[in-house]
From Swiss-Prot:
Its main location: nucleus. A motif (9aaTAD) lies at residues 1034-1042. It is found in: Nucleus. The lineage of its organism: Eukaryota, Fungi, Dikarya, Ascomycota, Saccharomycotina. Residues 66-93 bind DNA. It comes from Saccharomyces cerevisiae (strain ATCC 204508 / S288c) (Baker's yeast). The PIP2-OAF1 heterodimer acts as a transcriptional activator to induce the transcription of genes encoding proteins involved in fatty acid beta-oxidation, a response called oleic acid induction, when cells grow on fatty acids as sole carbon source. Recognizes and binds to the oleate response element (ORE) (or peroxisome box), two inverted CGG triplets spaced by 14 to 18 intervening nucleotides, in the promoter region of a number of genes (such as CTA1, FOX1 to FOX3, FAA2, PAS8, PAS10, etc.) for peroxisomal proteins. The keyword Transcription applies. GO terms for molecular function: DNA-binding transcription activator activity, RNA polymerase II-specific; DNA-binding transcription factor activity, RNA polymerase II-specific; sequence-specific DNA binding; zinc ion binding. This is Oleate-activated transcription factor 1. The gene is OAF1.
Length: 1047
């Protein structure tokens, strides 16, 4: 049984004859029973209000709603013995099913199905009540009339590993009602309209998008704002803009970046690392010759035709000449392609390690076409000859276009591996990769090939396949994407969806007589179309879920392809695939089809979260989210296990067998896809739980009775974030090397990069709230000191336990920060930018100064109006009312109200989820600047304070640490603060004293550390209108975060 699921009393119908043998319990519960909360707005099958019973002209239809709801024409949840609406309004609930005239010709199948569903409903109801009684006996929570009659239909789930009690009574708080509710109706989308705006753009932020937590979390907004603001002159770093002219208007921006670049290059150990530093710094400055501009051009080139009105011919007469367009394309392909042997090596690597995860082509047809087109050049062994023949010219060009993208993807999948520790490819060595790189020009040429065919008007399976691989390039390429910018890959996926429906991919190919006729179509195209559609539904669903946009209703499109609600839908699909296989012994292809179908099922399940959180009219029950969580987690555990690779071998001698090696490679691809599916699941659960928590945080100041929900989702968010960190750490520490080869892990690291921002920011927000709770509790202890108030002991116990919890969470956050720095910083540009911000934050956290900087910002005076306006329309921070910021934060922070038992429970759950070593502290980088020159001519020296394998951490001291972080303390301790207040008169001093009194992490004195280098002295910086050194984060190119010239 699934906890928090809802089994509604069924209604009879002739079409209700679904099988009672589910392939998957989760799918049986997920698709045969609609998710609670989605019926009203997102289901096309919601029952319409019933007409009067006196209409004899209509056939008899038994109504299963209660009399009160039927009379008021209101949707009834059909709970027994009383529906939710009647309980809410105190009405008498009467179900008169037995009194209604039965249908003239009743359906036996419908009756049997109805009785079976009734049985499941009452069984689920009984298990729910039994669970409540057991919990009441254990004293963990109290029952209430609302619990008994609620529409949630909870049932226990023994598979959930980290189950936390949803609600339990808050003792000692008179504002909270006696007895707790376990459900409430909420609305996230309408209640929290969120927009990022500048003078050049506007963008709505959806509840499940990456930026929602940054924009919606008031704690994080204030922290980020305190980092943006300079503490000496109350000015903001101006270069947070997409306007490249800022480097000319403020030359110090470019100068500081070049100093950072020089320092980082000195720490690089390989040429690859140096190239990445050059590329990333050029991209931040937006040089005209940088790869980023090329990438933008690549994306935009898909939207226009570069060949005018000339299009490729499909055949030419024997002995005739090709068109100029075709000849030019042939010449370009021959010029760019490497030798035939190298092509084969890249292609075979793709087949072995990439294709199982991205199965968008029909391999046999593709290989047959290439074998008739590409040949070794007898005059030049390093080149190939392309012979097009006289027929099927367009299909051959399409396959050439596919080849170009495939070669790039094959190169990309192995290019950024650490070859000193990575598994060795049977086909590609580091020498081959270095000698024969595949540049981005391959993608551009592929797009020109498509444009030459007028691809928007003349779509086919090959063009769809090529577009899917182009999407894969933009989605998985480490250079693509940006922190705080939503990478517009969904533009490509939307085009693919549009073209796919135009050629009928959304219907099973057996529906079309032309496709099943051997005289008009290749039989192998049938299964190709099937796997293409599954892939498209998966891609579009993932895009919509990750970015929080309105989904394209893939579940309705799947209805024309296959009845996905059927528990045996996988069996039906696989039978169709087997029936159309040209080689019935092709077990690899069958296996790929099966796994692709499961991945599409997961994408559809996850889309329920998007639909739920995007509800605008009305609201949804909180138990709907719990229902979705449970069914998705069960489905993931059942269908995406991580299987050891050696399980396919009987003994060690089999490991040398090529068939066994091929089988292990397929399993490794499945494991890598399973792993990133697990990350995807946890990521969306985290974003959902944080969105719900932030919703309750905004309401709790007005309604104290929702404290149990606030507490629950604070804990759930914490556990979701730690669960993701646990996955990251296990992967980076090599605990999955027995199951996932590094050659198939390109998609894993990409999904980790996608999840990293949400994970780190969520955990940081939790740490900020705990830190403020410690401050609030300690303040209360000081007020009560000298009295005999019995609460002092409890308050001190809370402070101690919260301090332990804070240190554990900070260690977890710092650990994943270091892992991301070592493995991702110089591979993924979004991580490079995000960690530049976190360099400052982590430095503050190490010194215990997260709140120190916030308190200092609150004391500022005479802020520039441009700063106030900019931060208001982008982050939503009201700096014109900053004197009330701290009061508002303390008012909405109810973490201090957690009981000692609550804190103990959270601590226990954290220890179960992730092992935090109390003595594990990441290295503190110290930079030798004794020569007095900015960054000096000498190589900066680093001191490691722990024994670790993080050899690359020497490269992590960005100028952010040099500028703002390393000097942050000394700057704050130099006399009075801006605005005239002394340090002793600010809340900071009190916070420092509290830190010392509660044995929290003290603020480390930086007097013995590095001095601020010449050229970055605050006095010199203040002479300019915008003082900001690099530590002020003046090198971000948030394209829509800050406008170019706010007046």
């Amino acid at each position: 049984m699934v906890e928090n699921s809802t089994q509604k009393a069924p209604h009879a119908g002739n079409d209700d004859n679904s099988s009672t043998k589910p392939y998957s319990e989760a799918f049986f519960l997920g698709f045969n029973n609609p998710t609670p909360g989605l019926e009203a707005e997102h289901s096309s099958t919601s029952p319409a209000p019933e007409n009067s019973e006196t209409h004899n002209r209509k056939r008899n239809r038994i109504l299963f709603v209660c009399q009160a709801c039927r009379k008021s024409k209101t949707k009834c949840d059909r709970e027994k013995p009383e529906c939710g609406r009647c309980v809410k309004h105190g009405l008498k609930c009467v179900y008169d099913v037995s009194k209604q005239p039965a249908p003239r010709i009743p359906s036996k199948d419908a009756i049997i199905s109805r009785l079976e569903k009734d049985m499941f409903y009452w069984k689920d109801k009984a298990m729910k009540l039994l669970t409540e009684r057991e919990v009441n006996e254990s004293g963990k929570r109290s029952a209430s009339p609302i619990n008994t009659n609620n529409a949630s239909g909870d049932s226990p789930d023994t598979k959930k590993q980290h189950k936390m009690e949803p609600i339990y009574e808050q003792s000692g708080n008179g504002d909270i009602n006696n007895g707790t509710r376990n459900d409430i109706e909420i609305n996230l989308y309408r209640s929290h309209p969120t927009m990022i705006m500048s003078k050049v753009m506007k963008r709505e932020v959806k509840p499940l998008s990456e930026n929602y937590i940054i924009i919606q979390d008031c704690f994080l907004k204030i922290l980020v704002t305190s980092v943006f603001l300079d503490t000496s002159k109350n000015t903001m770093i101006p270069a947070l803009t997409a306007n490249a002219n800022i480097t000319r208007a403020q030359p110090s921006v470019a100068n500081n970046l070049l100093k950072l670049k020089e320092m980082l290059i000195r720490q690089c150990q390989t040429e690859d690392e140096k190239n990445r530093v050059n590329e990333f710094t050029d991209r931040i400055l937006q040089n005209t010759n940088s790869n980023r501009n090329l990438k933008i051009g690549m994306l935009l080139s898909m939207l226009y035709n570069s060949v005018g009105y000339q299009y490729l011919e499909d055949h030419c007469p024997q002995g005739g000449e090709y068109s100029d367009l075709l000849r030019n394309l042939i010449n370009e392909c021959e010029a760019i392609l490497p030798s035939y042997e190298i092509i084969e090596r890249y292609k075979n690597h793709f087949y072995e390690y990439v294709y199982p995860s991205l199965p968008f082509i029909e391999l046999e047809i593709f290989e047959e076409s290439l074998s008739q087109t590409i040949f070794p050049d007898p005059n030049n062994p390093s080149k190939v000859q392309i012979r097009m023949g006289s027929t099927h010219l367009r299909a051959k060009v399409e396959n050439l276009s596919l080849l170009l993208v495939i070669l790039k993807l094959s190169y990309m999948s192995i290019r950024f591996l650490d070859h000193s520790t990575a598994d060795s490819s049977f086909y590609l060595s580091k020498e081959i990769i270095d000698k024969y790189p595949i540049p981005n020009d391959f993608i551009l040429l592929s797009q020109r090939c498509l444009a030459s065919e007028n691809w928007c008007a003349c779509a086919n399976e090959n063009i769809i396949s090529c577009l899917l691989y182009i999407w894969s390039f933009f989605a998985f390429s480490p250079e693509e994407g940006d922190f705080f910018l939503e990478h517009p890959t969904d533009v490509i996926s939307s085009l693919i969806m549009m073209l796919s429906t135009s050629i009928g991919l959304h219907r099973d190919p057996s529906d079309f007589p032309q496709l099943i006729s051997p005289s008009t179509s290749d039989k192998r195209t049938l299964n190709h179309r099937r796997i293409l559609w599954l892939s498209i539904v998966t891609v579009c669903s993932f895009e919509a879920s990750l970015k929080g946009r309105h989904s394209v209703s893939p579940i309705s499109l799947m209805a024309l392809f296959l009845n996905i609600k059927d528990p045996d839908s996988l069996t039906v699909y696989m039978n169709r695939v087997r029936g159309d296989l040209s080689d019935i012994n092709n077990h690899k292809l069958l296996r790929i089809h099966k796994f692709t179908f499961k991945r599409a099922q997961l994408a559809l399940l996850l889309s329920d979260l998007d639909n739920l959180t995007m509800t605008y009219y009305g609201s949804f029950h909180l138990h709907s989210i719990e229902f979705i969580r449970e069914k998705i987690e069960i489905f993931v555990e059942e269908n995406f296990p991580i299987v050891p690779l050696k399980s396919v071998a009987q003994d060690k001698s089999d490991l040398d067998d090529m068939n066994v090696i091929s089988e292990m490679n397929i399993l490794s691809s499945e494991n890598s896809s399973s792993f990133h599916n697990r990350i995807m699941n946890k990521l969306l659960m985290l974003r959902t739980s944080m969105a719900v928590f932030l919703h309750f945080e905004t309401l709790i100041t007005k309604d104290k009775s929702i404290f149990p929900f606030y507490k629950k989702y604070f804990m759930v968010s914490c556990m979701d974030a730690l669960s993701l960190i646990n996955y990251f750490n296990k992967f980076f520490n090599g605990e999955y090397r027995h199951a996932i080869s590094s050659l198939t892990s390109f998609n894993v690291t990409k999904f980790i990069q996608l999840a990293l921002s949400s994970t780190i920011f969520s955990l940081l927000g939790i740490i900020l709230r705990i830190g403020l709770a410690i401050h609030m509790l300690s303040s209360e202890v000081q007020k009560l000191s000298g009295t005999t108030d019995p609460r002092i002991k409890e308050l001190n116990t809370k402070v101690e336990k919260f301090s332990t919890l804070q240190r554990d969470l900070e260690s977890a956050l710092e650990g994943i920060y270091c892992s991301a720095s070592e493995h991702l910083r110089f591979t993924y540009f979004p991580v490079f930018k995000m960690l530049a911000l976190f360099d400052v934050i982590v430095q503050r956290m190490r010194k215990g100064e997260l709140w120190h900087g916030i308190f200092t910002m609150i004391q500022m005076e005479q802020m520039h109006s441009r700063i106030i306006k900019t931060l208001s329309i982008t982050l939503g921070v009201k700096l014109d009312k900053k004197d009330r910021l701290l009061e508002e934060l303390m008012a909405c922070n109810h973490v201090a109200n957690f009981s000692v038992e609550d804190i103990d429970e959270l601590n226990r759950n954290i220890k179960k989820e992730i092992q935090i070593s109390s003595g594990l502290k990441p290295p503190v980088n110290t930079i030798d600047l004794t020569n007095g020159e900015p960054f000096g001519n000498a190589v900066p020296t680093f001191t490691k304070t722990w024994s670790s394998s993080l050899d690359n951490l020497e490269k992590l001291s960005s100028a952010a640490a040099v500028g703002q972080s390393l000097d942050y303390n000394s700057g704050l301790r130099q006399g009075p603060l801006a605005g005239g207040g002394s340090k002793e008169q600010t809340p900071i001093a009190g916070m420092n004293n509290l830190n010392n009194s509660i044995n929290a992490t003290p603020i480390v004195d930086n007097s013995s550390g590095s001095q601020l280098p010449n050229g970055f002295d605050r006095g010199q910086a203040n002479n300019t209108p915008f003082p900001g050194y690099f530590g002020g984060l003046d090198l971000f190119d948030y394209d829509f975060l800050f406008g170019n010239d706010f007046a």
